[in-house]
Amino acid sequence: LVNLLLSAETLQTLAREEPETVSAMAEAVAAGRAAVIGGELCERPLPLLPPEVIADQLRQGVEVYQEILGTRPKVFGRRRFGLTPLLPQLLKSQGFQGCLHFTLDDGRFPTGNQSRIRWQGLDGSTLEALARVPTDGSSAETFLRLPERLGDVLDLDHSATMIFAHWPGQASPWYRDLQRLASFGPVLGTFVSIAQQFEHSGSTGQAVEYAADQYRSPYLRQAVAARQRDPLSRWRRFGHRWATLQALQTFRTLASVVTGSPWTRADVEALRRQIESALECDADDTSELDQSLNEAAQAAARDLAAALGSASAEGSGRLALNPACWSRKWLIARQTAEGAEGVPTGAAAPEARSATVDVPGLGFAWHSPEPPAAQPGARRSWWSRSKKSAPPMAEGNVLRNEFFEITFDPTTGAIRSMVDFAGRGNRLAQQIALRTSESDTLPEDWDGAPTTRTWYSIMAAEALEVVTPGPDYGEIRVRGRLCDPYGRRVAGFVQTTRLERGSRLLDLHIELDPEMQPDPEPWKSYYCARFAWDDESAELRRGLHGVARPASSTCLESTQFVEIRSGSASTAILTDGLPYHRRQGYRMLDTLLIVQGETARRFRLGVGFDLPHLPAAAQDFLTPQFVLPGASQPPSSTGWLFHLDARNVIASDWQPVVESGQVVGFRVALLETEGRRATMSLRCFRTPGRAWKLAATAEAQTELPIEEDRVRVPIGPYEYSRIECRW
């Protein structure tokens, strides 16, 4: 018996280059002499990807196995590191019966003394898993120590199992001898396929749930060691591209369900493949992909506007379209005296007032550029006091709005304090720094060995200026340099800090001009944005696949956010797609900006104070604004097409259901983000006829109740599911 661990992409390559080998493989699988382990189209870095990408990779992979081999793998496995607590529910939804809870690459994952476990995922679903780390089938040492290993397994394991792994054609001759011995009798055991092991051996019966911090990927260290280009910013680009692609798909689906005309998925699928492939390549210029993606998203927005009855280029207003399932507030500039229009970018004059437009989730809002007519005020008595004017939002080294106040250090340019008006004490401080180590300039210690010391650079401000004092937003820009402990310049920096009126989100734009490059060890030498807080007992949480999970490790991974929770106060760092963060002690966190091989020099971060729904805010930080200029007013100035009444549920991956060339319904993915069970209502602009939760088989699908224009959907904690609704 042979167990073949290979991805669908590898199988496609074999079918193209070695068709005879694949034909023999298919015959062996059909005859039961071989079993295939796999599942994905290709081995992507799963812990950093959104659930939609992982589910799509599994779906495409299963289709490839079925097409080439005539069967699909029942057990999921991969060589490269990629274990994450989200996998059990996604694998069960795709019809997998078991998985390998180990990888043959670098990285860290939890192990135990049992070869068979019931792996429990984020949502509580369980999947049978094989957790025994394989031994090297090509090494003679494995067989010299075989009696000892067999004794340990028989002593501790509920179902005694040993796993041998080797590259094709590289097995030890002793491994072949062991197979011959086993063919005469089961004295030393019986060789079985992975599928047979799951069928014949019993489970331990107890579900095992591992924390997210027990898994640590080797992606950053591997990327720097392989001299890959942009090991950090490629994830930022992916986050923005994926958010734009989701907006494009949502707009097209909304337009389709309104007009009844389907749209072709070929160009969207091509863009999706390019976005995912860009994670693995070192292309110097990806502007063509960004241009194609942005043009397609704008075209989809115009199609939706036309479906809503708003003709573009025929009116004087603007139509704001929201692809997210939550409402969004945007700052849109009114027409100035010179007739200029547009969303302010920081260069607008203080007198160019803006309007805050509230756009419903999965809806639209039309905005007139003309300021509202002045209302006649009440006659003021001679003894009444004149209204005290509000202080400017930015003055000197202070930036403020209704909720909090930011104070800059005039000497260093760092943010000295972020003070919440509703509480007491400093919530957060921030600075830019280079972290590195040196040993050649330091004296020897007492035993004669050279001393290595890790140090952080020091900020020195050269200019601190108020760019915009208000009244709609304030902006302060700091220019300066970073110096080593001896005063030598190592980099230049520009940080622009922006705060809008009525917002709980602080926007940081950072530009770096490094003169000293980081060392090859990326987790120990880097340029970073460093944050500090005063509560040593504060709990850290990080975004993982769109949900918040506790974070206690030193090295953290999150492309969405890191939350600092102290009592009832929540301070969140929105990472804008930057994935790697290092905790220093109990009160400091470094968000990595530049490591060796990184070419990006401009970065954006956000700091949110008591944001009500953090996963949605993090996704909103990545999603672009869609405002169509010159749009005529639709029949209704504002409205929505779909509405979710549960704020802890995020809808994504909208697709139309097409039959006989007509749109007869839609599909959507739902993710519960806060660990709370709920029965939510999905309201539709048109009365639905039938709806159900999708599953791996038709028998496992669940019919959903419908009440007028509402589809009632029960959803569990951290559950990711897909529903289908037909008119």
Task: Please give the residue ranges for each predicted region.
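The substrate-binding groove and active-site-proximal loops of carbohydrate-active enzymes
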Residues: 5-15, 39-55, 70-81, 102-105, ...
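N-terminal catalytic cores of secreted or lumenal carbohydrate-active enzymes
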Residues: 1-49, 53-56, 64-65, 96, ...
